[in-house]
UniProtKB/Swiss-Prot annotation:
SUPFAM superfamilies: MoaD/ThiS. Signal peptide: none annotated. Belongs to the UPF0125 (RnfH) family. It comes from Yersinia pseudotuberculosis serotype O:1b (strain IP 31758). NCBIfam families: PRK01777.1 (NF002490). InterPro entries: Mopterin_synth/thiamin_S_b, RnfH, RnfH_sf. This is Protein RnfH. The gene is rnfH. Gene3D superfamilies: RnfH-like (3.10.20.280). Pfam families: Ub-RnfH.
Amino acid sequence: MPDIRVEVVYALPERQYLRTVSLVVGSTVEDAIKASGLLELRPDIDLEKNKVGIYSRPVKLGDKLNDGDRVEIYRPLIADPKELRRQRAEQAKK
């Protein structure tokens, strides 16, 4: 069976991780993340909590991959985006 090549990325404010992996056709997002080794390298990644996407489009761990996809592991939000916008608007008024 032919292989597909995908990238798996995880970004922190101080460091970015990019791993290219070769997988069999029909592999899933979860397969790529496990093959990348990022789960062992970054114990803070919890696939039950962290959302994932392909090229900024949210996907599920069981979704199939295509050759050339970029799997992105997203960090949980620390603050509520609405609250941050409200605070910035108040700051701008001053």
